[in-house]
Each structure stands twice: as structure tokens, then as C-alpha cells.
Swiss-Prot record:
CDD domains: AGPR_C_ARG5_6_like (cd23936), AGPR_N_ARG5_6_like (cd24149)
SUPFAM superfamilies: Glyceraldehyde-3-phosphate dehydrogenase-like, C-terminal domain, NAD(P)-binding Rossmann-fold domains
Protein name: N-acetyl-gamma-glutamyl-phosphate reductase
Active site positions: 136
PANTHER family referenced in this protein's UniProt entry, alphabetically: N-ACETYL-GAMMA-GLUTAMYL-PHOSPHATE REDUCTASE, CHLOROPLASTIC-RELATED, N-ACETYL-GAMMA-GLUTAMYL-PHOSPHATE REDUCTASE, CHLOROPLASTIC-RELATED-RELATED
Gene: argC
The species this protein was found in: Xanthomonas oryzae pv. oryzae (strain MAFF 311018)
UniProt similarity note: Belongs to the NAGSA dehydrogenase family. Type 1 subfamily.
Length: 316
């Protein structure tokens, strides 16, 4: 069966996530990249910045109306938080049937948008045209908490450490290797956007304390969970194994996963299940690549599901 080529454009392509998106699109047999928008790189060949893409397309500096005028079948918005609305409004007006996937926080609380964490929200992708990609930490938190959600006796406490690519490309203390050297930088220790996101999605309060580390990519999340009743390690491990048995991107491991082993990989590792005396407090560790499963890979899963393709197409 011949599958018709679907056109796609990326807005905000200079960033780390944009680069990963270009690689995935280049590997996709059914997608044709028709525009890549970046003010800073306008006029330069995409292939000069991304070896995975070898065609002649050049970066363009496109405002919202120019993006809408391209009339692509799919548009992925990889913009900093607070910048998506003009693009969405222009697409809504010009080509409402365009599939829009937004990677920012801007629409994660909007009930008109589908919240796309496939392993937990796979049920109703068909026909969706507006999909909000979860946050990187929010993805790790939800996947770690969900198998024990019905057993919680109080708010999970989540201690997160991310590589500095999570702070984007705009210079700041949180992506300055000199300031991060031999350092761990805490920030937004209460009311972080991902804390609110996870609390809203799971329907329980969650406490989250993020930190930035000197490595470039990858998240380690250590989650402390209090349980209503004692459970054995085997019972807890079985909950994770059964919940994610059919999820190829989620690997349940025995020991606590290392962030160095997940960097550059598309999936999530969850493990290191450790019980405190009394078996009513458990600690679980998750790792994922913030640029991949925390952003670009998840966007590609969402795209594939919304268009009725195999979920892992282009995800090697």
C-alpha cells in the first residue's frame, strides 16, 4: 500500500529539541520537511547544521502568518514557553485541519488540546489536531507514579536532576558550563510548572524539586512514595512490569538506572525500587533523555498516533 507523503514544518528549530526533531523527520518514510523556522539561522542550509538531513532546505525566519501560509499538514512548535499562541491562532484561522503539536507549557492545561503522553493517554488519538507534548520532568514523574497511584498515602516527593540542555540555548546560569562545573544548581523548588502539570494530570498533589547538573543531556528522577498499606518489593516491581508490559519505550530494571546510560536513547528506564522498614515507604528512580522521550521522541509518537501510523515509525 502506498502511503501519501505528509508535509511537516518545525518552528523553533535552532534549539536542541529542534535539532532532534529534524533527525526524526529525516528518518521518517512518510514525512517531507517543507519548512524550518529559525530567526538566528535564516538563510543557512539545514544540512550544514544537521548531518541527518541532506536535502537543500534552508532555515527561514517566519512569523505566525507566514507559517500558516505554508499550509503544512503538520506543524511542530518547539518554542520557548509563552510564544505559541500567535502561531496557533494563525493556523486556526488559515488551516484548522493542520495537526499542531506544541512542545511548550502553553497548552498543557487547556482542555481543548489533547495531552499526549502515549503510555498513559493512548486511548483517543484518532482525529486529534491539537496535541500538547508533556514536559520532560512531567513525563518521568507521571510514568513513575502512575503504577502506584491508587496506593498513595500522600503527595509523592520528586527530586530531579537534569542536564543543562533542559535550560535551552538562551544563555543563563542554568546552561553555563563554567558555573555548573563541580556544581548542582537548584531552582524553582516549589510550584514548578511540571509540578502543577503532573498534579493536574494525575489528580493528586505532587511535590517536585528540580536541579541542573554539569552534564549535557538526560534526567534522573528519584521519587519518594508513601503507601496506604505495606507492599513487598516483588508486588511493587510487578505493578511496574504489568503496567508497562506492552510499552516498548519503557524498560523496568532491577537496579537504579544511570542517566549516562539513557542519554541519546528514546526510552525511559524505571527501577531501583527500595523499601523503607515497614514497607509503606518506597523510593523509585527513573531516567530519560530530556531531548528525546522528554521532547522530540514523544512528539514523534504523538504525530504517528494522530495520523494512524505505527507509533515507533522513525524512532530507532
Amino acid at each position: 500500500m502506498t502511503v501519501q507523503t505528509t508535509t511537516i514544518g518545525i518552528v523553533g528549530a535552532r534549539g536542541h529539541t529542534g535539532s532532534e526533531l529534524i533527525k526524526l523527520v529525516a528518518a521518517h518514510p512518510h514525512l517531507q520537511l517543507v519548512f524550518v523556522s529559525s530567526r538566528e539561522l535564516a538563510g543557512q542550509r539545514v544540512a550544514e547544521h544537521n548531518q541527518a538531513y541532506q536535502a537543500e532546505l534552508r532555515y527561514e525566519s517566519l512569523d505566525a502568518n507566514a507559517v500558516a501560509a505554508k499550509a503544512a499538514d503538520v506543524v511542530i512548535l518547539a518554542l520557548p514557553n509563552g510564544n505559541a499562541a500567535p502561531f496557533v491562532a494563525a493556523i486556526d484561522a488559515a488551516t484548522p485541519q493542520t495537526l499542531v503539536i506544541d512542545l511548550s507549557t502553553d497548552y498543557r492545561f487547556d482542555p481543548a488540546w489533547y495531552y499526549g503522553l502515549p503510555e498513559l493517554t493512548r486511548g483517543s488519538y484518532a482525529g486529534q489536531k491539537r496535541i500538547s507534548n508533556p514536559g520532560c520532568y512531567a513525563t518521568a514523574m507521571q510514568l513513575t507514579i502512575a503504577p502506584l497511584l491508587d496506593q498513595l498515602a500522600g503527595p509523592p516527593q520528586c527530586f530531579g536532576v537534569s542536564g543543562y540542555s533542559g535550560a535551552g540555548t538562551t544563555p543563563s546560569d542554568k546552561n553555563n558550563p563554567a558555573l555548573l562545573a563541580d556544581n548542582l544548581m537548584p531552582y524553582a523548588l516549589t510550584n514548578h510548572m511540571h509540578e502543577r502539570e503532573v498534579s493536574a494530570q494525575l489528580g493528586v498533589p505532587v511535590e517536585f524539586m528540580p536541579h541542573v547538573a554539569p552534564h549535557f543531556r538526560g534526567i534522573t528522577l528519584t521519587v519518594n512514595l508513601w503507601l496506604q498499606q505495606p507492599l513487598t518489593r516483588e508486588q511493587i516491581q510487578a505493578r511496574y512490569t504489568q503496567r508497562y508490559a506492552d510499552e516498548p519505550l519503557i524498560e523496568i530494571v532491577d537496579e537504579a538506572p544511570w542517566v549516562s546510560r539513557i542519554a541519546g536513547r528514546h526510552g525511559v528506564q524505571i527501577g531501583g525500587v527500595t523499601l523503607a522498614p515497614g514497607n509503606k515507604r518506597v523510593v523509585v528512580v527513573a531516567t530519560l533523555d530530556n531531548l528525546l522521550k522528554g521532547a522530540a521522541t514523544q512528539a514523534m509518537q504523538n504525530l504517528n498516533l494522530a495520523l494512524g501510523w505505527d507509533e515507533l515509525t522513525a524512532i530507532g
